[in-house]
């Protein structure tokens, strides 16, 4: 199981949102690359980055900070937020990003995303509100069930699916493990669990269910999880 510490970027700062609401942003660092270095020192191998401004704008908005993180660490990076076309994918790969997360475009055009996954290291981000897929920075809900979307990627070459229950995200109320397993069963792909991780109990649940990875955000920033210990135990 892979532990993915998370950095969400808004206006060049590292923040966390509650339930995906931009006006709920709480700033945790003005120098996100320093946070990334700390994660690396703790033993992380991967970093999960979301360009929040990019997710709402539909194009990259925090490139400078992303470049700084890339230059200052040897972490493997998966990145999402505002990646809607092939040019953006190429641009980020040229920067040295290891995996790109496609969300809104993956919901709107599974055929295109499956074609892109033949050429590039792609993860699909499935973000759900009440079981339905949310897009465009979680601003809108598509009339498609998350599990039905996951099933569309069953035969694709995507590397994994990042499954987020938005109602849990940033709430520290515990992971919705049933939702994660539903996505895993529907897609038959490796799944990264996201949204609501509150304690090391959640991480144990992920491990027990043979889930590929888990994203840790607010639980670390608010001191609910000893990240160094979790990384050591799951190395």
From Swiss-Prot:
Metabolic or biological pathway, per its Swiss-Prot or TrEMBL entry:
Amino-acid biosynthesis; L-histidine biosynthesis; L-histidine from 5-phospho-alpha-D-ribose 1-diphosphate: step 4/9
GO biological process entries:
L-histidine biosynthetic process; L-tryptophan biosynthetic process
Instruction: Give the UniProt keywords, A-Z.
Output: Amino-acid biosynthesis, Cytoplasm, Histidine biosynthesis, Isomerase
Does the keyword Amino-acid biosynthesis belong to this entry? yes
Q: What class of enzyme is it?
A: isomerase
List the GO molecular function terms: 1-(5-phosphoribosyl)-5-[(5-phosphoribosylamino)methylideneamino]imidazole-4-carboxamide isomerase activity
Q: Cite the active-site annotation.
A: 8 (proton acceptor), 127 (proton donor)
Keyword Isomerase tagged: yes
| Cross-referenced InterPro entries | Aldolase_TIM, His_biosynth, HisA_bact_arch, Isoase_HisA-like, Isoase_HisA-like_bact, RibuloseP-bd_barrel
Q: Which reaction does it catalyse?
A: 1-(5-phospho-beta-D-ribosyl)-5-[(5-phospho-beta-D-ribosylamino)methylideneamino]imidazole-4-carboxamide = 5-[(5-phospho-1-deoxy-D-ribulos-1-ylimino)methylamino]-1-(5-phospho-beta-D-ribosyl)imidazole-4-carboxamide
Gene Ontology annotations for the cellular component aspect, listed alphabetically = cytoplasm
Report the subcellular localization: Cytoplasm
Entry coiled-coil feature ranges:
none
**Known EC number:** 5.3.1.16
**Listed HAMAP family:** HisA
Q: What family name appears in the similarity comment? A: Belongs to the HisA/HisF family.
What name appears for this protein in its UniProt entry?
1-(5-phosphoribosyl)-5-[(5-phosphoribosylamino)methylideneamino] imidazole-4-carboxamide isomerase
Q: Which organism is it from?
A: Nautilia profundicola (strain ATCC BAA-1463 / DSM 18972 / AmH)
Taxonomic path: Bacteria, Pseudomonadati, Campylobacterota, Epsilonproteobacteria, Nautiliales
Query: Which gene specifies this protein's sequence?
Result: hisA
């Amino acid at each position: 199981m892979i532990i993915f510490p998370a950095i969400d970027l808004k206006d060049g700062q590292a923040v966390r949102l509650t339930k995906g609401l931009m006006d709920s942003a709480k700033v945790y660092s003005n120098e996100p690359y320093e946070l990334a270095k700390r994660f690396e020192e703790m033993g992380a191998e991967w970093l999960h980055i979301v360009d929040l401004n990019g997710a709402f704008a539909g194009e990259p908005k925090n490139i400078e900070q992303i470049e700084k993180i890339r230059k200052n660490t040897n972490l493997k990076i998966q990145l999402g937020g505002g990646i809607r076309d092939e040019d953006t994918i190429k641009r980020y790969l040229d920067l040295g990003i290891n995996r790109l997360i496609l969300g809104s475009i993956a919901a709107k055009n599974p055929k295109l995303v499956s074609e892109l996954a033949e050429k590039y290291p792609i993860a699909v981000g499935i973000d759900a509100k009440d079981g339905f897929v949310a897009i465009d920075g979680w601003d809108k809900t598509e009339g498609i069930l998350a599990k039905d979307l996951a099933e569309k990627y069953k035969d694709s070459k995507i590397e994994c699916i990042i499954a987020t229950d938005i109602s849990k995200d940033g709430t520290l109320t515990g992971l919705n493990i049933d939702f994660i397993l539903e996505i895993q069963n529907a897609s038959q792909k490796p799944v990264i669990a996201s949204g609501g991780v509150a304690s090391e109990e959640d991480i144990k649940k992920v491990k027990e269910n043979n889930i590929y990875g888990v994203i840790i955000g607010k639980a670390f920033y608010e001191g609910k999880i000893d990240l160094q210990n979790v990384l050591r135990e799951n190395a």
